[in-house]
């Protein structure tokens, strides 16, 4: 199996090393694992692509590259340059440091990398490690993802739904903020939304007197509705959420047509 991996935390992020280990387990001794990841931190860039300026790319080692772009850029660089036409059998994005559940899905570069792979017609999975009080004292905060990641991905490869429609299916996987031994299992869960974690800005003044703003988010430990992604994570389960690129509110189409059509 040929596997392409990327992330949004950058080429030197510890979660990428975790994903490389997961991918090596899946690829097997005769497989290939290719890494094309951002040269710098790209958290929060969602599905952005750098079509207004060129992207520098550097080979760091065998099958390992850093690109000065977003996770979606990295997927494009891999498919149309690095791999020289060879198609990966699977694209994995992560393992993100922090959860990409609930509204974080919409901001996540990790999810954006998987989304671009799906739009290119490839099976793709985004993986993230929820962090919390139970992971703070661990020598490896990615312990849960490292221990159970290959099994969860293999489960999706063997039993998951994959299709060839225009807005292809891909998966968002979040590992709960618990030690690996405390994992309670996995749950298929819809994307949820938190009520008190909206982003805002925090103003500051520089030493030279210039005003600047930091983007600030809310607490991540707030649960979503029962049975949705962040809620099951906080109960100790891996959340597995099928996603599509289609953002249409299909449940509102007929009602809107009746009102204004």
From Swiss-Prot:
Xref: SUPFAM superfamilies: SurE-like
> What is the cofactor note?
Binds 1 divalent metal cation per subunit.
Question: What are the names of the required cofactors?
Answer: a divalent metal cation
Annotated catalysed reactions: a ribonucleoside 5'-phosphate + H2O = a ribonucleoside + phosphate
* Catalytic class of the enzyme: hydrolase
Name the Enzyme Commission number(s) assigned to this protein: 3.1.3.5
Subcellular location per UniProt equals:
Cytoplasm
Q: Does the keyword Cytoplasm apply?
A: yes
List the record's Gene Ontology CC terms alphabetically.
Answer: cytoplasm
Q: Which InterPro entries match?
A: SurE (IPR030048), SurE-like_Pase/nucleotidase (IPR002828), SurE-like_sf (IPR036523)
Q: What does this protein do?
A: Nucleotidase that shows phosphatase activity on nucleoside 5'-monophosphates.
Which family would the database say this protein is a member of? Belongs to the SurE nucleotidase family.
Q: Which NCBIfam families match?
A: PRK00346.1-4, PRK13931.1, surE
In Swiss-Prot or TrEMBL terms, this protein is called 5'-nucleotidase SurE
